[in-house]
Amino acid sequence: MALTTPLSITAIVPAAGVGSRMKADRPKQYLLLNGKTVLEHTIEQLLAFPLVNKVVVAITDGDPYFPELTLAQDNRVIRVSGGKERADSVLSGLSYVQEHQLSEWVMVHDAARPCVRHSDIDKLITEVIPEHIGGILASPVRDTMKQATQEQCIETTIDRSVLWHALTPQLFTTELLYSALQTGLDKNLSITDESSAIELMGYQPKLVQGRADNLKITQPEDLDLAEFYLQKMKKETK
């Protein structure tokens, strides 16, 4: 890593979602992968990265699953109340980070992305700090992209050379991201990820190319693929 000054980063994991598309008996972050929940894999991967000091996880009040996890007793894992929308949950985490002065920088990571690699996190940090106000991991679109009509017919083909899939982590300064999210929520703006809130303030976050296998579990078939990737990552670290 090219950074020469000491750096500490807090990871924020919004984990208050229901994940209805999984059609499971519990939220997708609590489904099992290789004997552990998806959330455990995700948080453990973040905690194992040297620059991450704490993981602030936003959980729905009354969540019956999180307290049963071993990592719930880890003093590096901080639980805060999650909100109705992703932005509310992230803002709750940011409030804790600011109140306790945990770090100048935060990175927000999806609870359902357990396959993020340390090499990608390292690349994100190295390319974003200190030259940019923030940035995200992203993957270039490889497929031909079609714009559809309301009747689901093809209206036109979109130039994919300028399109990227937004991934996580997304890395920003604590103060800027808090201000962006709070402003967006106050104005009832559409905030789909942290970067979109920053963009609405007129900034252009850095795109850092990450691996496409940093998948987000959203469909039942994603579990098998995530399990394969996790096993592959484990073999590569031996």
UniProtKB/Swiss-Prot annotation:
Any GO molecular function: 2-C-methyl-D-erythritol 4-phosphate cytidylyltransferase activity
Pathway: Isoprenoid biosynthesis; isopentenyl diphosphate biosynthesis via DXP pathway; isopentenyl diphosphate from 1-deoxy-D-xylulose 5-phosphate: step 2/6
Coiled-coil stretches noted in the UniProt entry, renumbered to this chain: none
Keyword Nucleotidyltransferase in annotation: yes
Site positions for Positions MEP for the nucleophilic attack: R160, K216
Gene Ontology annotations of biological process type: isopentenyl diphosphate biosynthetic process, methylerythritol 4-phosphate pathway
Site positions for Transition state stabilizer: R21, K28
Keywords: Isoprene biosynthesis, Nucleotidyltransferase, Transferase
Domain of life: Bacteria
Catalytic activity field: 2-C-methyl-D-erythritol 4-phosphate + CTP + H(+) = 4-CDP-2-C-methyl-D-erythritol + diphosphate
Keyword Nuclease: no
Job of this protein: Catalyzes the formation of 4-diphosphocytidyl-2-C-methyl-D-erythritol from CTP and 2-C-methyl-D-erythritol 4-phosphate (MEP).
Xref: PANTHER family: 2-C-METHYL-D-ERYTHRITOL 4-PHOSPHATE CYTIDYLYLTRANSFERASE, CHLOROPLASTIC
HAMAP family, alphabetized: IspD
Name of this protein: 2-C-methyl-D-erythritol 4-phosphate cytidylyltransferase
Organism expressing this protein natively: Aliivibrio fischeri (strain MJ11) (Vibrio fischeri)
Source organism phylogeny: Bacteria, Pseudomonadati, Pseudomonadota, Gammaproteobacteria, Vibrionales
